[in-house]
Every structure is written in C-alpha cells, then in structure tokens.
Amino acid sequence: MTFSGTTLERNRKTALYPLDLELTERRVGLIGANGSGKSTLARLAGGLIRPSGGTVQVAGYDTAKDAKEVRRITGFVFQNPDSQIVYPVVEEDLAFGLKERGFPKAEHAERISRVMERLRISHLRGRLAHELSGGERQLVALAGVLVTEPDLLILDEPTTLLDLRHSRQISEHVAALPQTVIFVTHQLELLTEFERVIVLDQGRIIADSDPDDAIARYKKAMA
Ligand SMILES: Nc1ncnc2c1ncn2[C@@H]1O[C@H](COP(=O)(O)OP(=O)(O)OP(=O)(O)O)[C@@H](O)[C@H]1O
C-alpha cells in the first residue's frame, strides 16, 4: 500500500497533512491522540474516502479511481458496530456479508461456524443483534468481516467495548491471520507483536517505528 503526497481536507480544515508512506508489513498499528487522523488514514487505506490531494494505491489499485475494487478486497471493521450490522439476526447478518461478496450459499454455514467458534461467540448465532451488549455487537461486526476473509483487514478501534479476555482473544486471533492487518487502537498493549507502529499527531506522522520505540515516543508526546 502506497500513500503519495496524500492529504485530506475537511471543511477547509486539514485532517491529514501531505504524507508519503509505503506499507509492506503484515501488521501495522496506528496510534495517536483523539482527532489526530487515525480513522482518516484508515478510511483512506480502505478506499472509503478519497484523498483531497495525492494518491493512495492498494494492491495496485488507485483508491480514487478503483474504490470498488479496493473495497472488494478490503474488510473494514468500524469503531461503532452498529454502523455495520444490517440484519436483525446475527447469523443472517454474517450470511449477508458472504452473499454480498459472492460466496456460494453452500459454504455459508461452515464459514460462519468456524469464525464464531474462533471468536467464541457461537452462542450468539441465533440472537437478535439489537439485543446484544455493545461488546457482543462489536464481536459480531468483527465476525461479519472475518467470514469473508478479505486480503486486507482494517480494524478501526475494534476492541473499545470488549472486556480484557475478548480484547486479548481478538489480538491473538488477529496475530494468527494470514492477511495484512492495519489496526487502529488506543490499547497500546495489543500492538506489542506488530511489525510496525505509526504515531499520528494533529494530522502528521510523528513516529514510524517498531512497537516499543513508537509507543515510547507516543507516550512522550502525550506527557
Ligand atoms: N466527517 C467529518 N467531518 C468533519 N470533520 C471530521 C470528520 N471526521 C473526522 N473529522 C475531523 O478530522 C480530524 C481527524 O479525525 P479522525 O477521526 O481521523 O481522528 P482519530 O485519530 O481517529 O481520533 P479518535 O482517536 O478520537 O477516534 C478531527 O479533527 C476530526 O474532527
């Protein structure tokens, strides 16, 4: 993934100053203060928004020109699970994502079982999504993306509502995934095994390093 002179303006305010970034690692963490531009960068990477200037290339596609292709190979998990759970019953919701991405119906049940077991949420399969707790919904939203096995997984604070056990489980699960993962989080301990951690501050990259170094610099910047 390549960002070249990429910027993002919103309402004449700069959310992201020009940045050049080549991401080749399988595990990239994004950290930084509230409003520093993490979600903006993640959304640009997933082709959900277009840069105001410069380009973003994902798997050879320009996200401004081929947003559809980029979204096809990308799974995006939002901070707020309600923005991605569509169907009333959990299982139907997971099947919807599979159907939308063209997975044969015969595979649905097995794919859903596998991911739900891995996230230890099999018991939620027949439940109504709106009756679940915030954390349970977050897990279902994550499962909804994982079932489709996207090439690129972008997780924007996917563990904010989870208890310690589930956060760790997600982190272990993510560690075992073969795909490329971009992980936005304020839970710094979830990134200790990551290959690369980028620190944003007021729309600029202030550190880009290994987890220990990047986290230390982030803490210093926040002191
Ligand atoms: N839809 C929007 N319209 C206008 N401004 C926005 C919009 N989304 C984000 N912003 C602004 O862009 C800047 C960067 O926001 P962004 O969501 O990328 O930050 P973040 O680092 O993900 O923050 P947080 O840790 O709070 O989730 C902020 O100043 C924010 O107010």
Per-range role (PLM):
Residues 54-65, 70:
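Conserved ABC transporter NBD signature motif
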Residues 106-124:
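Conserved ABC ATPase "signature" region
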Residues 31-33:
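The feature captures the beta-strand-to-loop junction immediately N-terminal to the Walker
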Residues 128-132, 136:
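Conserved ABC ATPase signature
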Residues 46:
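Helix-to-loop junction immediately C-terminal to a conserved catalytic motif
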Residues 204-223:
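Conserved beta-strand-loop-alpha-helix hinge in the C-terminal portion
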Residues 153-157:
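Catalytic Walker B motif of ABC-type/P-loop ATPase nucleotide-binding domains
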